[in-house]
């Protein structure tokens, strides 16, 4: 038999080679297997795992040792205030993507009935985070992957979010209307031959890679979005840390104004905001 304390220590040691947060990973796996909170793990470290629990835990650890992200093993990832279902059909939501949500909530009029579009919604993270905070707004989300849309719809249903609609297709072309107050997106932006892709091999490549310069999807969105925004509407795009200057040039060439670069807590350029002229 193995206690929670012993299991946490053993797993943490095993995962040091594949994880920057081995102890947290160990605790999350134990939470999942034992169906207990982290507070319970700390409060009752002497509790013993039965043979079935040990077998399941061992299988999870083996998957993690092969580099599979903890979110896929658990089948869920927290984003904003939401616990979202995730599978290898969708990109794992990142904390830095919350910048898109924060900007929208802070800068658009709270009490008006606005229409927002989310392009390449994946798990629905951005669309659902905005929808849950602004239940009187209408959010239309698109994705070219039917499998991803299925996950997004499951997440919407799980959180009883009624003001978010999902559409299958490429970027803006899948949208049902052309009068959005803001369009947001976290499109693929990694160059096809970037070595970083190897570290992300478990996630859907089509949600990560975008041509030789990583800008193929962003170029399409910048050009298309003008026709789907109201005059003065906003376009927000997450991008790679070294792409800001090129994206700003693309936006200027397409007639956008009030173009600003937003940086993350590390001071890296992460998001471009622009307004339709």
Swiss-Prot record:
Q: Where does S-adenosyl-L-methionine bind?
A: 120-124, 143, 171, 186
Spell out the disulfide connections: none
A Gene Ontology biological process term: translational termination
What is the top EC class of this enzyme, as a single word?
transferase
Q: Give the matching Gene3D superfamilies.
A: DNA helicase RuvA subunit, C-terminal domain, Vaccinia Virus protein VP39
Q: Which reaction does it catalyse?
A: L-glutaminyl-[peptide chain release factor] + S-adenosyl-L-methionine = N(5)-methyl-L-glutaminyl-[peptide chain release factor] + S-adenosyl-L-homocysteine + H(+)
InterPro entries membership = DNA_methylase_N6_adenine_CS, HemK-like, N5-glutamine_MTase, PrmC_N, RF_methyltr_PrmC, SAM-dependent_MTases_sf, Small_mtfrase_dom
Function in brief: Methylates the class 1 translation termination release factors RF1/PrfA and RF2/PrfB on the glutamine residue of the universally conserved GGQ motif.
What the record says about family reads: Belongs to the protein N5-glutamine methyltransferase family. PrmC subfamily.
Protein name, please?
Answer: Release factor glutamine methyltransferase
Q: Which gene encodes it?
A: prmC
């Amino acid at each position: 038999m193995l206690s929670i304390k012993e299991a946490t220590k053993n797993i943490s040691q095993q995962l040091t080679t594949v994880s920057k947060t081995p102890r947290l990973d160990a605790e999350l796996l134990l939470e999942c297997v034992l169906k207990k909170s982290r507070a319970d793990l700390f409060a009752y470290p002497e509790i013993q795992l039965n043979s079935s629990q040990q077998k399941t835990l061992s299988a999870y650890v083996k998957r993690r040792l092969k580099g599979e992200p903890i979110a896929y093993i658990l089948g869920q990832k927290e984003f904003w205030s939401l616990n979202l279902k995730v599978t290898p059909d969708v990109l794992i939501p990142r904390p830095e993507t919350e910048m898109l949500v924060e900007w929208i909530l802070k800068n658009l009029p709270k009490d008006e009935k606005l229409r927002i579009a989310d392009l390449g919604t994946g798990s629905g993270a951005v669309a659902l985070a905005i929808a849950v905070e602004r239940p009187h707004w209408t959010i239309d989300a698109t994705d070219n992957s039917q499998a991803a849309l299925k996950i997004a719809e499951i997440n919407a249903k799980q959180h009883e979010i009624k003001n978010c609609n999902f559409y299958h297709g490429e970027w803006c072309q899948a949208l049902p209307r052309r009068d959005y107050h803001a369009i947001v997106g976290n499109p693929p932006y990694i160059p096809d031959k970037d070595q970083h892709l190897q570290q992300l091999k478990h996630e859907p490549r089509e949600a990560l890679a975008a041509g030789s310069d990583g800008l193929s999807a962003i170029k399409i969105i910048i050009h298309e979005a003008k026709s789907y925004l109201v005059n003065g509407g906003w376009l927000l795009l997450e991008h790679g840390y070294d792409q800001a200057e090129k994206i700003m040039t693309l936006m200027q060439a397409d007639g956008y104004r009030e173009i600003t670069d937003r940086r993350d807590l590390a001071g890296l350029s992460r998001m471009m905001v622009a307004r339709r002229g």
